[in-house]
Amino acid sequence: MIGAIAGDIIGSVYEFDNIKTTVFPLFTRKSNYTDDTIMTVAVTDWLLYGGNLVQVMHRYGREFPCPMGGYGARFGQWLCETNPQPYNSWGNGSAMRVSAVGWAFGSLEKTLQVAEETAAVSHNHPEGIKGAQAVAAVIYLARTGKSKQAIRELSPIH
């Protein structure tokens, strides 16, 4: 989770202004967290304390309504709905918020199941689910000491 949040903050200044170099300052005065950090913390809160995932995500969305870069248009609408439904997104938002799932469980199967659950509340398109599962699986496999080669072979998406 720390890596996901640090990466989000480091990349925040380049989100809409891509660079083509590996030499850049990691943190600047303009660096800040984005919607991806907010939803990563929301998912982690849900993993730790339970409750209804949609309600937890809505609470964080209300508490942090204007992150740097904003929420995606459809996700922003989803946050405003009183009865939010999945909207078949195949975007990367589900993958961006799932990192804690890779640390939370003792089996790859459970990790994949919960990654799907965290994705499906909004990103219920098969690609949105696969993205979340891939990120959570790679984190789980690395955490459990698998080699790079084994991670490539065992990752459900490669």
Describe the function of each predicted region.
Residues 1-157:
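Structured, active/binding-site neighborhoods that engage oxygen-rich ligands
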